[in-house]
Structures are given as C-alpha cells and as structure tokens.
Amino acid sequence: IQIVDAQNRPMFDLAGTLLKDYATALLLEVGKYLNTVPNRITISGHTDETPFTGRRPNYTNWELSADRANAARRALIDGGLAYDKIARVIGMSSYVLLDKANPRNPVNRRISVIVMTKAAEDALLRTDTPSDAPSNTPSNRPIETTPAR
C-alpha cells in the first residue's frame, strides 16, 4: 500500500516528522482496515533527496525517515491496528523515490505500508533470528565487560 494523497500533497513538511492532519486521518482509517486482514505489515518511511540540515548533528535522512515510519506506526495503532500486526518499522531515506524524475518532489516524503504474505513474514522472521547465525559471530558471542573502578 503506497499511501499518497490524491492531490499529491506530502505527508510531512520538509524535514518534519509530524504527520499532516489529512495524513493522520487517512492512517487512522487504514489502521481499522488492516486489522481485518490476517497478515502482518511492515512500515517504511521515506524522504526526498533534500539533505537534512537541522541543528541536530549526525541526524540525517536515515533518522528522519525512520522517525516518519514510527509516526505512521503510532497513527495506525491509534486507528485501531493491533500492535502485534506490525512486523517491522524501517527508514529508507531517499533510496526508494516515488518521483524518480524529480527527487526533491515533496510527494517523495511519504510512508509505505506492505501487507506481507505468510511466506514473506516467515522469511523475515528467519533472517532476524539470532540463532540462525553461526555461534562465533559477534551477535552471539558473550559480551565481556570490565567493572568500573
């Protein structure tokens, strides 16, 4: 589900993480509907190619897109979506543009909701399971710490 306003209005202001009122209203309705399907969903946040130049050091379009995805997640849950229906929330920065011909087009500031098939959900869960990794990988090694003195 690519959520785009019929008038091609952006879902977010430039560099913003607060959903526009019309986007919130749409997500509240979508949240109710998504609860009627048995599948889980993923939510992706997107930016246009305008570099983020806010006052926060090291805050880039990656963080901005992830914050947008979480704003959408909250609106979907407020609309009635069950918390356990969400399998993943991710930020995509500007790597999946809706308007590739105009990468700074505000319509690229959006979220995507993917309703997964059972096979896709199973594959996602398999790739995120630490027990699938060899035991000598950093993710499964015990963390060694030295107590502070």
Question: Can you say where each PLM-predicted feature lies in the sequence?
Answer:
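Loop/turn elements at helix/coil->beta-strand transitions in domains of secreted/extracellular proteins
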Residues: 37-41, 85
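Short amphipathic alpha-helices and their capping/turn segments at secondary-structure boundaries
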Residues: 27-36
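Periplasmic OmpA-like peptidoglycan-binding domain that tethers envelope proteins to the cell wall
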Residues: 4, 13-26, 46-126, 141-149
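Hydrophobic alpha/beta scaffold of the E2-like acyltransferase core of 2-oxoacid dehydrogenase complexes
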Residues: 1-3, 9
